[in-house]
Design a protein with these regions (language model features):
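Short coil/turn segments that connect the beta-strands within blades of beta-propeller domains
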Residues: 111-113, 161-162, 202-204, 254-255, ...
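Hydrophobic, well-ordered beta-alpha structural blocks that scaffold small-molecule cofactor pockets
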Residues: 1-105
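Asp-box/WD-like beta-propeller blade repeats and closely related beta-sheet repeat scaffolds
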Residues: 184-201, 208-219, 223-249
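Short, conserved, GDST-rich strand-edge loop motifs in beta-rich repeat architectures
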Residues: 116-131, 259-274, 347-366
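Surface-exposed loop and turn segments in beta-propeller and other repeat-based domains
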Residues: 189, 224-245, 289-296, 326, ...
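Beta-propeller blade signature
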Residues: 133-139, 272-283, 360-376
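Repeated scaffold domains used in trafficking and secretory/extracellular systems
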Residues: 100-106, 151-161, 192-201, 242-250, ...
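Loop/turn-rich, solvent-exposed surfaces of beta-rich toroidal or solenoidal domains
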Residues: 297-321, 325-369
Length: 399
């Protein structure tokens, strides 16, 4: 502001007893006058500065003044100024103090439809039971309405052209749905404990991850016929113990598949949490997976966003936009990640293993739901799903 108004007189628009004192600490010169539309303030003084009606601005040469908006109802003021030939940035701006307020207003008034997959059981004798039960939910931010679109216990969900595919954990089926969330088909899975799914459009293949067998399978998206299968290592077979790596979620970019897991060495059940993400080359599918991210604690939700591999270090509640940038940190078990071009969405589940985080955090949040998160400012808003327990995946249909 001081640079733009260097050779001009400063005028404040809006006699605000809140915003003017804050703004005056940032402006290096004393304002020439204040304008305000409220007739009760006409020709009065505020802090030694004359208050005049907005029409006063129309008699000024635009190049001689710089207007700083100091009213919370800035949208109407901006409209008035633009309609009268003033240019944003050149002739006027909002007070720098409005940055926080405007972000709050943006988040408060934001609307988005967020698809949430929930893996809760419907059987109240099961540990992962919740009152609402699992399913695919639509959370409409704005009116803040929750609707269950499909009943079930769902893990990862992916949009593949005009269809969606979702892994149903209890039925051991892959659901195929249209974009209205009508079930088109259910494909039998050849084993329990499938979790992750991704779609590679050039090959028209679905990539499925099994958390017990630690396998990555390729299926034709039209017929669901299996094309190939990679076993992450021979450790499960040799030891006759399942889920030693605990592969879970997956994403794909062109020829490369990225899969997250609890332990690269296969020792997480022994307390060795060397979790991470490995890259698998589809052109050399049975080659050795290449670890690209290490040192994570039960990670989930790898996603390619803006050309970078983003992921969640779930137990620590950390969100990374690449392996060097810790973009956000949350006080719960983070799983489920999406981006709509403006905000990130990070899912959070009730933490069944809170004692493992004692001493590592000052707060352990037990709510299920998701955050709307601005990575630049670290501002967030939490949208609770109080009758659910486990959020697995988040999807934004329209970006």
């Amino acid at each position: 502001v001081n640079s733009l108004a260097k050779d001009k007189r400063v005028v404040l628009y809006g006699r605000s007893e809140d915003w003017i004192p804050k703004s005056l600490t940032k402006i290096s010169k004393t304002p020439s006058y204040i304008v305000d539309r409220n007739p009760i303030y006409k020709n009065t003084d505020y802090r030694g500065i004359k208050v005049l009606p907005p029409e006063t601005l129309l008699d000024e040469k635009k190049e001689d003044i710089y207007i700083v908006i100091t009213s919370g109802v800035y949208e109407g003021i901006i409209t008035f100024l633009v309609e009268n030939g003033f240019t944003a940035g050149i002739n006027f701006c909002c007070s720098p103090e409005f940055r926080d307020y405007s972000l709050l207003e943006e988040i408060r008034n934001y609307e988005q439809e967020v698809i949430v997959s929930c893996s809760d059981y419907h059987d109240n004798t099961m540990t992962r039971y919740s009152r609402a039960g699992g399913g695919i939910y639509k959370y409409h931010i704005g009116p803040n309405e929750i609707e269950r679109l499909v009943k079930g216990s769902f893990r990862q969900i992916v949009l593949a052209g005009e269809y969606l595919y979702a892994v149903e954990f209890v039925e051991c089926k892959l659901y195929k749905l249209n974009t209205a969330f009508k079930v088109i088909a259910k494909y039998d899975l050849d084993a329990a404990n499938y979790c992750g799914i991704a779609y590679e459009p050039r090959r028209n293949i679905l990539i499925l991850v099994n958390a017990a067998r630690d396998t990555v399978s390729l299926h034709n998206a039209d017929s669901f016929e299996m094309v190939d299968r990679l076993v992450y290592s021979d450790k499960n077979l040799n030891d006759e113990v399942t889920s030693q790596h605990h592969l879970n979620d997956v994403c794909v970019c062109d020829d490369y598949v990225y899969v997250s897991y609890f332990s690269h060495s296969g020792n997480w059940k022994k307390g060795i949490h060397d979790g991470g993400i490995s890259e698998i080359n589809l052109r050399d599918f049975h080659g050795k997976p290449l670890p690209v991210v290490r040192g994570l604690w039960k990670p989930h939700s790898p996603q390619l966003i803006n050309g970078e591999l983003c992921y969640l270090d779930s137990m620590r509640g950390r969100f990374y936009t690449n392996d060097q940038v810790l973009a956000g940190e949350f006080h719960g078990f983070a799983r489920g990640l999406a981006f709509d071009g403006r905000f990130y969405y990070i899912g959070q589940s009730e933490d069944m293993y809170m004692s493992r985080r004692f001493g590592t955090t000052h707060n352990i949040m037990l709510n299920a739901g998701f955050y709307l998160f601005d990575a630049e400012t670290k501002a967030s808003r939490f949208y609770p799903m109080l009758d659910n327990m486990n959020i697995h995946d988040i999807l934004i249909m329209e970006q």
